[in-house]
Design a protein with these regions (language model features):
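Domain-level signature for proteins that mediate thiol-based redox and metal-cofactor handling
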Residues: 1-102
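Terminal targeting/low-complexity segments that flank the catalytic cores of oxidoreductases
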Residues: 20, 85-212, 233-234, 238-239, ...
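Short glycine-/small-residue-rich flexible loop motifs, especially phosphate/cofactor-binding loops
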Residues: 48, 229, 279, 383
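Short, surface-exposed basic-aromatic patches at helix termini and helix-loop junctions that form
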Residues: 49-55, 233, 283-286, 313, ...
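Alpha-helical transition-metal enzyme core signature, strongest for iron centers
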Residues: 51, 185-193, 214-232, 264-275, ...
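Amphipathic alpha-helical segments within well-ordered protein domains
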Residues: 197-201, 279-282, 295, 309, ...
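Active-site-proximal alpha-helical scaffolds that flank and shape metal-associated catalytic sites
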Residues: 230-302, 331-332
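Short acidic alpha-helical/loop segments enriched in Asp/Glu that coordinate divalent cations
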Residues: 240, 288-294, 310-325
């Protein structure tokens, strides 16, 4: 019978010696004897309890002669442990939760893998977790990890990234218009926060890159809400107007229960259109502070659109009926919103005034033309993304025209 020795000195099992003892036993074959030496007063008692709890045989010293392998130990012999099989038996039936790398995902991770890290050994008999989004084809994007890392690296601090003290020389009417647009943006970004936050909690942790990406997407939107609000209150005490039509449009996003459809309506159509809006506001910003806000927000939104497109392209390749479902989602949303006002006049007028920069006939003509061009760019962008997803050109044009007049 093989014997090894462990000298604990004055360290008791209740002081960390149990960790040393487990580490000594772990690589040994069952039946190996471990002679434990030590001077802690309660070591023998604690060794007996340790052995009973962890499935090893224990013999107290009680004057016994130390095994040869332990003869040179300085502390007296407290007893011997014979390595048992209980520790190994505990992990019978355990399984690996896939492989740790992104290439190690499986199609449908089981509920009993629960919160285990991908690649971990999962003990049998654990609780089953219900994650509604547990099929790879529903959520996965091959570049999810890359997009998450890019998002994490591109995080910006509102306190330092934006020149809050930049001078403002524009007229009051332009500031009022900006506050109205910012109020509208805050409302829309709140919806854009709630949608990924809700689905993040439904994704099986096996697809951790998607979970992380949705979480950081929500964090992006939280930061946008912060900076839009802070800019709106720089020179005013109250925000602008929130309309029934705008909230009704956003409710159709917040209430959409299907991840693919919600991603399509929010990221591909809504945030895709918002990219053009943020670019417009960057160009026509009345001050350097506002321009910086719009530029940074657009950088974030571009990643959101990229993930929406990437995972829907992959999803469509694995589900032939997805495009039909996306088409129906647009048509259903259009039918729900067809009797609403769409983009409220206050927001439209505010965009015209921001582009004009002044309340003059010449300025209004210039501003109105700029907003018309913005709407044309939004439509062209939607059609391009729809065609990339697989819709024919004429169908893409028809579906783009059905998109909410509220932009998001």
């Amino acid at each position: 019978m093989t014997t090894t020795a462990l000298d604990l000195g004055g360290l008791g099992l209740d002081q960390g010696a149990a960790v040393l003892l487990r580490a000594t036993l772990a690589p040994l074959a069952p039946g190996t004897v471990v002679a434990v030496h030590g001077t802690a007063p309660t070591l023998g008692v604690h060794l007996r309890a340790f052995a009973r709890a962890e499935g090893h045989d224990f013999t107290a010293a009680d004057g016994m002669v130390a095994p040869t392998a332990a003869a040179d130990q300085q502390a007296p012999l407290a007893g011997t442990l014979v390595r048992g099989t209980a520790a190994a038996a505990r992990w019978c039936g355990a399984e690996r939760a896939g492989a740790a790398t992104a290439t190690g995902t499986i199609d449908h991770p089981p509920p009993h893998w629960g919160l285990a890290a991908r690649g971990a050994a999962v003990e049998a008999g654990g609780p089953a977790f219900h994650f509604a989004l547990s099929h790879r084809d529903e959520v996965w994007s091959d570049d999810a990890g890359e997009l998450y890392r890019a998002a994490a690296a591109a995080q910006w601090d509102p306190a330092t990234a934006i020149p809050w003290d930049a001078p403002r020389h524009h007229p009051d009417c332009v500031e009022d218009a900006l506050v109205q647009v910012l109020t509208y943006l805050i409302e829309n970004e709140t919806a854009a926060l709630l949608v990924p936050a809700r689905f993040c909690a439904q994704v099986h942790p096996h697809f951790r890159e998607v979970m992380q990406l949705l979480a950081i997407q929500s964090a992006d939107e939280a930061r946008h809400i912060e900076v839009f609000t802070r800019r709106a209150l720089l020179a005013r005490d109250v925000l602008g107007l929130s309309t029934t039509g705008g909230q009704t449009s956003l409710q159709t996003l917040v209430d959409e229960p299907d991840f693919a459809l919600a991603s399509f309506l929010l990221s591909v159509l809504g945030e895709g259109s918002f990219l053009h809006l943020l670019g417009f506001l960057h160009v026509h910003a009345p001050d350097r502070c506002t321009a910086s806000i719009m530029r940074l927000a657009a950088q974030d939104e571009a990643r959101h659109v990229a993930f929406g497109m990437s995972h829907l392209l992959r999803h469509a390749a694995h589900e032939p009926t997805l495009l039909a479902r996306l088409r129906l989602a647009i048509e259903r949303r259009h039918a729900t919103l067809q009797h609403t006002a769409g983009l409220n006049a206050e927001v439209f007028d505010a965009l015209v005034l921001l582009a004009a920069g002044e309340l003059t006939p010449t300025g209004m003509a210039r501003g109105h033309a700029a907003v018309a061009e913005l709407q044309a760019q939004m439509d062209a962008g939607r059609r391009a993304r729809l065609k990339k997803l697989g819709f024919a050109s004429d169908e893409a044009a028809t579906l783009s025209a059905l998109h909410t007049r509220n932009f998001m």
